């Protein structure tokens, strides 16, 4: 035997892909080889002229070792920087059983409520935490970050307010990263931001105002008077409040505000160099239909039992398109679950003890400094002690002394230094920091500490009184609660999730391991650059790999969701055109088949949407495109186009589309939702795109997390690169100075980038191209097998689809009365999550199997849909009544088959319709959820469940 043949650097590709299935899959689609298949599927006109310029693959062990070497270049100092990011402790029971558990992180956004009741309950818990702490009756299930939430509050204030003004007041004490993002958003909404002293906010006329509750430098101000004066004028008031401080302080609602927002990172989520973290967003009840993001509500199921669901979805981009309240799609569900569970585990007494400890340590430190003659700037504070040394030299000396001792402080200005205390602060830290600030080695502090918060600002009401926050404080109880919820959810650790346009592929264990390494998770986003060399190397690696894959000249990693990447790409076009003296270009062409985020994004940037028709094959109608591009040539800004098309087909005219837009003065934005069908086969930049957003949570293996996190970096041609987002506190190496940001952190959700780095490193150049080929092969195998029972709506060259296919249920629905929803719910009885329902065409299922599913799993899924087709036939033939059959009654629960049974089909037909289901059985926790009841009777807090038993 040859020793060289016993080492296999491509071992991971063989774990990600099912190479042993190749011959059978090719035979099923009537092809002799993979090369022949790809040649018959992908138009030659779009094929990239050269191979991918990526390194060869490394094994799992070698990739982890290499990444560990990179991570070790980061320096973990004790962080006292603050500014919205704080060290915290993730309870280990939550770390292991949620964050590191594929039952939680591989699930999709809970559109199919019946198989997502566990996650929905966890998100409802999160909402209840936000409701209790803010005092408002309604809270959402997370936004992307605090800065984005502030921008959303500004937009919502304009929607719901009555003041006829385009001016918005911003407290000068807000975090600088928040103001940066608000400037970006305000410009294209046509708002004027006025930044000033909070106490003078009522001196002008504003449609809205934002105050920081615990200012950026640590002060806590009583906002009641100024809020009252603004409310008297009709101004909508938002308060950005530190979530931990609200454990002790009066709620924003009690202060008189209309909206509260902030970051929940302090509730057990690592800093992670800036993200991901779940922002909270709470508000008055009358604003609920104008709010951005997901809201979880209590409804009932078909049997009358309480059931949870995503409520008020008619506000959202996939329905309202350019009239949506926001372009938000993915949010931060996994991080919201972590924060909610932190409150569940610690309970009201536990979180108060933590908040009191933080405040007591800060107060003790301030007392010691004052007794030593130092000037503590703010007399009333929660966690941040700011000291003015009166001269730069002394401030420099203190800052350097702390750094030498392993502490990162915040330099407020030339003469001021701040220390922000947090959950992991300890008494020995007081000694070290006192030495740095005073030069003295001894520090004796009294055990009895007087707090620095005014009595009139303290919270008087009780928080977290619901039983869920008072029942699971031992690890055994918490472990079992988490397991109970996990078992109510269908995630990819149970079966494939074939959601079209979502790319639910393997999230390999080796990819996930590094995100909890302290070298990545415990780094503050504003840590000194010398301490973040590992992150800088990781970022550079990522940018170079993404440039090689897409063909673009520059990459921005800042956008922390796909929708935000979309916004950022279009923003770069707008900024470029303004710099060219073409700010008047405000027409955006969007194909009729586009995802709802596209028109919503265009509207956020002040663009007017002009819809382009598609032809009978699902392709962009080139004649209509040409006519509309020429009609609007003087005002044409861009086209937003998805490739392969949203209909799952490689459009052969993509180069012509790009040429027509360019000839008429526009730019080409390509939506990267379907990038999984491109890598190694084509490059978006090479076919004519000017900018592209990529979903790292689709194509590049970051898990969907049950509704986030995601990352949406953009690739840009050289002429657009200077207009990518910058950052007010970080000199981003991928953007020019002077451009405002789109996210709170310079590199978005940086701590999950190691997932994509590992995927690219373990797959290598050959594996990445193989992944694309397998995605195409699996999709065409499914389409070919299902075409025997269902029409495949759109196909391209040689009758092929790209990486997904659309099954047309409309003829069957017309004949039987069985709807696409009935089929989606019936799939649950077989143990499968439904494909994408009624998008991009109503009455269809869009199926994307991805490259990482085996033939055995594909065959189970195909057998399921074939079995369902036979069930529909029984309805057509009259064997089962139209109003009483396994489809309209789906899904079936364990309670159904153990109770009275009066249906014309058997219990076995209901829950074990095929032999394999017995082995793989997943039991939905509730029957079909009543969406209408839930929206008409909106409850988005944790009610006593017995209230709903009747």
UniProtKB/Swiss-Prot annotation:
GO terms for molecular function: glycine binding; glycine dehydrogenase (decarboxylating) activity; pyridoxal phosphate binding. It catalyses: N(6)-[(R)-lipoyl]-L-lysyl-[glycine-cleavage complex H protein] + glycine + H(+) = N(6)-[(R)-S(8)-aminomethyldihydrolipoyl]-L-lysyl-[glycine-cleavage complex H protein] + CO2. Transmembrane segments: none annotated. Gene3D superfamilies: Aspartate Aminotransferase, domain 1, Type I PLP-dependent aspartate aminotransferase-like (Major domain). Its cofactor is pyridoxal 5'-phosphate. Its EC number is 1.4.4.2. It is an enzyme of class 1 (oxidoreductase). Keywords: Oxidoreductase, Pyridoxal phosphate. GO terms for biological process: glycine decarboxylation via glycine cleavage system. The modification N6-(pyridoxal phosphate)lysine is found at residue 698. It holds the Pfam family GcvP2_C. One of its GO terms (cellular component) is glycine cleavage complex. Belongs to the GcvP family. The glycine cleavage system catalyzes the degradation of glycine. The P protein binds the alpha-amino group of glycine through its pyridoxal phosphate cofactor; CO(2) is released and the remaining methylamine moiety is then transferred to the lipoamide cofactor of the H protein. The glycine cleavage system is composed of four proteins: P, T, L and H. This is Glycine dehydrogenase (decarboxylating). It comes from Neisseria meningitidis serogroup A / serotype 4A (strain DSM 15465 / Z2491).
